[in-house]
Amino acid sequence: MSQEKYIMAIDQGTTSSRAIIFNKKGEKVSSSQKEFTQIFPQAGWVEHNANEIWNSVQSVIAGAFIESGVKPNQIEAIGITNQRETTVVWDKKTGLPIYNAIVWQSRQTAPLAEQLKNQGYVEKFHEKTGLIIDAYFSATKVRWILDHVEGAQERAEKGELLFGTIDTWLVWKLTDGAAHVTDYSNAARTMLYNIKELKWDDEILEILNIPKAILPEVRSNSEIYGKTAPFHFYGGEVPISGMAGDQQAALFGQLAFEPGMVKNTYGTGSFIIMNTGEEMQLSENNLLTTIGYGINGKVYYALEGSIFIAGSAIQWLRDGLRMVENSPESEKYARDSHNNDEVYVVPAFTGLGAPYWNQNARGSVFGLTRGTSKEDFIKATLQSIAYQVRDIIDTMQVDTQTAIQVLKVDGGAAMNNFLMQFQADILGIDIARAKNLETTALGAAFLAGLSVGYWKDLDELKLLNETGELFEPSMNESRKEQLYKGWKKAVKATQVFAEVDD
């Protein structure tokens, strides 16, 4: 093995941690993955053990080295990308978390979010953070931990505790406590950060009674945050020089550098992000305004629509209903369905995300007849993912007065050709599937490599990630609109069913 240099991306996700080593062409040299425990203390609560996450990251770093034969001193820089919003509070001295990490999906702080809404803070939070008040974001999770762990508020006020999203936790661990930092994209998801003024918002901190002393320093997405402590990186002292929340990292990995460019990642959930350039644009239709990335002294904003259930609907077909043995099989069954698409599945298992934001909604099925088959049901579940994406793309076009010409896609479910073709049909636009579907990790690697000169500039990156396949719409307009009208009716009925009885 020659002394070629590489970039390592650490991709810390909701169900597993991965380390991927990339070469100068942006190609994957090796990767390692490790799942970790999902903790469900009560219905609707989701937690992780932050130490177990750290151990899984250590394990995959080793795995990537072993698989490739690359040595720690051949890693030029490390990029980190992470599940966003998930919240850790730990002891500054011992480095031990004082409670489990509360995961982005967890609804345990929903009563706190409702309280803030009822107190009339909706507009204020939206204008400052670009977000809607929801248990999804970190703010109420921090408040919950400080409320439920004995003495935590007092210790936080004394400066004995630290808060971080997963990126912050990993950098703190990798540098052995030398760096307590986060980046623009992760800070923007806490509901504590003023995305216009680019600073922690004192008024929001006061409303929530969260001491400023526990917050990390906010930095750009591409700069050196610190170096690995040799005993945490198998002898290597390597700069950690790129960082972004998973969806923003995918935006960067998809090379969506121009305003108006849009990407969708079909993962557990589905996250559609549009680069809106250097102007912050507040949505009037329940999309989130967030920071895409900050690089070279400039900050690029984004509009985002979050769908909570996408790929996990296919997992539900596999694990919950046992209709398929593996996810790819869903494509075959969908093609074998010969009904007229009259079945609609609304997979609101954890409520409805953008643009509805109805946390009481639950999954429902419409249009069943005696003739409905397993194939029809599977097809309707795949189609539900595409319909939800259309909800958001339509909203984005209204908000920005921009006609979206092409949707760049990545993520596991983007491998499903039936879903991609139906997505093109129901949107009426081209779907460009990335050749390298590792766009999230690649985005983190690009950010890290740029800041140490491994790649020269954005123009060099543009040569690296080509489109793999283009799906063009082939459905006629009236059929498309008829199907989508049925979906809107199904969502409306789902929301009526979810209405809380007086």
Curated annotation (Swiss-Prot):
* Record's comment on post-translational modification: The phosphoenolpyruvate-dependent sugar phosphotransferase system (PTS), including enzyme I, and histidine-containing protein (HPr) are required for the phosphorylation, which leads to the activation of the enzyme.
Q: How is this protein's activity kept under control?
A: Activated by phosphorylation and inhibited by fructose 1,6-bisphosphate (FBP).
What InterPro entries does the record tag this protein with?
Answer: ATPase_NBD (IPR043129), Carb_kinase_FGGY (IPR000577), Carb_kinase_FGGY_CS (IPR018483), FGGY_C (IPR018485), FGGY_N (IPR018484), Glycerol_kin (IPR005999)
What Gene Ontology biological process does one annotation of this record name? Answer: glycerol-3-phosphate metabolic process
Q: Where does sn-glycerol 3-phosphate bind?
A: T14, R84, E85, Y136, D246
Residues modified as Phosphohistidine: H232
Binding site residues for ADP: T14, R18, T268, G311, G412, N416
Q: Which residues form the signal peptide?
A: none
Question: Could you state a single Gene Ontology molecular function term?
Answer: ATP binding
Q: Does Isomerase appear among the keywords?
A: no
- Per UniProt, glycerol binds at R84, E85, Y136, D246, Q247
Residues in coiled coil: none
**Pathway annotation:** Polyol metabolism; glycerol degradation via glycerol kinase pathway; sn-glycerol 3-phosphate from glycerol: step 1/1
Recorded catalytic reaction(s): these are: glycerol + ATP = sn-glycerol 3-phosphate + ADP + H(+)
Q: Which PROSITE patterns match?
A: FGGY_KINASES_1 (PS00933), FGGY_KINASES_2 (PS00445)
Give the matching Gene3D superfamilies: 3.30.420.40
Task: Tell me the keywords, alphabetical order.
Answer: ATP-binding, Glycerol metabolism, Kinase, Nucleotide-binding, Phosphoprotein, Transferase
Matches recorded under NCBIfam families: glycerol_kin, PRK00047.1
Q: How does it assemble?
A: Homotetramer and homodimer (in equilibrium).
* Role: Key enzyme in the regulation of glycerol uptake and metabolism. Catalyzes the phosphorylation of glycerol to yield sn-glycerol 3-phosphate.
Full protein name: Glycerol kinase
Source species of the chain: Streptococcus pneumoniae (strain ATCC 700669 / Spain 23F-1)
